Amino acid sequence: YYGVQTLAQLLALDKLPLAEVTDYPDVPYRGVVEGFYGAPWSQEARIRQLDFYGRNKMNVYIYGPKDDPYHRTPNWRKPYPAREGEELKVLVNRAKENNVIFYWAIHPGQDIRWNEEDRSLLLQKFESMYQLGVRGFAVFFDDISGEGTKADKQAELLNYIDDHFVKVKRDVAPLILCPTEYNKSWTDVEGGYLTTLGDKLNEGIKVMWTGDMVVATIDKSTLDFVNPLLKRKAYIWWNFPVSDYVQDHLLLGPVYG
């Protein structure tokens, strides 16, 4: 698939050069998180995005707009209404056409109860998304307070999902966690939150990290800090470009680094 994309790029030139194509990624997961606050993207915008990802060899799209009420509180326990479910199914199929893994994320932390009932409801929600064609799942515990922030409970839940859903299905991508302490400035090392996740989470679960701050350049020092705590390579959520904290204008500076 990616070789064809490279060929298409070469064919866009006036002349096709004599070339040998050796095409493989250095980074296994390359994509975009729709995980901002404010009006979510439209269906048409998402379709354009997925087509763009395919042309440019990006292979992951994570659906998690904060203002989707069925993604987080109050309705994360409920299935999508029929119309919204069909729209998501269209996106899932478009993602497959573009060789993109469509991840659907749930954000239950603000009102989750650490009991069997909520665990069962979460798995039922994931099953409903699986029936729509979703084959990638994420659990977000970012930007919350209270009971939902407990690292041991988060790890217990993620391991249960991994053992009783992801591994059972056999065709689902690795589970992703966005932790509560997802950047260095919010990390209480002595409190042991990240260490607990590193010790207790199943090995295959990916853990997100935004760098030294919420919006930050990703450099070696931040990875040297977090990777030993997580006992795995951090799954980078690079907050660029993001404008949800300055909604009166767009941030359109160049990519650098």
Where are these regions (language model features)?
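Feature activates predominantly on carbohydrate-active enzymes
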Residues: 1-125, 131-135
